[in-house]
A protein has these predicted regions:
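N-acyltransferase acceptor-side catalytic subdomain
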Residues: 1-205
Length: 205
């Protein structure tokens, strides 16, 4: 993991002003493992984004949504979503970041998108929003396709509310299959500047 030269040692939360300033400047926090309290600031040379007009919805996912008719909610079980995302053998979400995301959620900057089927939470995602930018942090599924359903709904909502940037931080084969692309940090910062200075309709209601 490449860090930005700053290391926060054994603290329970990151300062709200500091974390928002970091995201607004193209920098984000990660931990090496969930067992360590230290947090590193990351500024990759290449960034992953999903252009909001390029998200790909497979026919099978459309059929799944039509058949199962999942219910989508925002921020009803934010901490459960973060815990679900961190409940893996290897994860970068440690206790410091968990506390930070909870703080951001209470302040209105961190959002969860939750998928319910038969009144049960089956997965979702969470991220940070600053004006016209949404920074996707992590997602997980208990039942098949739950995270894809959450992502599909979120991107539709962001598009309707005139957001211009969906940041995935890095890319993976899974994200590429959904429409993610990789751009340089220089190009990313130009998109970021426009997005965080853009007035948009609030998406998370």
């Amino acid at each position: 993991m490449k860090n930005h030269g700053i290391k926060a040692n054994s603290i329970k939360t990151l300062n709200l002003e500091t974390i928002l300033k970091a995201y607004s400047n193209g920098i984000f926090p990660m931990a090496e493992t969930k067992f360590e309290d230290d947090v590193f600031w990351i500024e990759p040379k290449f960034r992953g984004i999903i252009p909001l007009d390029a998200f790909r919805v497979s026919k099978s996912l459309k059929r799944h949504i039509q058949k199962r008719k999942p219910i989508i909610k925002f921020n009803q079980n934010f901490e459960t979503i973060v815990k679900g995302c961190s409940n893996r053998k290897e994860t970068w979400i440690n206790s410091t970041l968990y506390n930070t995301y909870s703080l951001l959620n209470k302040a209105g900057y961190a959002q969860s998108v939750e998928v319910y089927e038969n009144n049960k939470l089956t997965g979702g995602l969470f991220g940070i929003n600053i004006n016209g930018a949404f920074f996707g942090e992590s997602m997980y599924s208990i039942s098949p396709n739950a995270s894809k359903i959450a992502l599909n709904f979120l991107i539709e909502r962001l598009s309707k509310c005139h957001y211009t940037l969906f940041d995935t931080q890095f890319i993976s084969k899974h994200l590429i299959s959904l429409g993610a692309i990789e751009i340089t940090q220089e190009s990313y910062l130009k998109l970021l500047d426009k997005a965080i200075n853009k007035k948009v309709d609030y998406a998370f209601y």
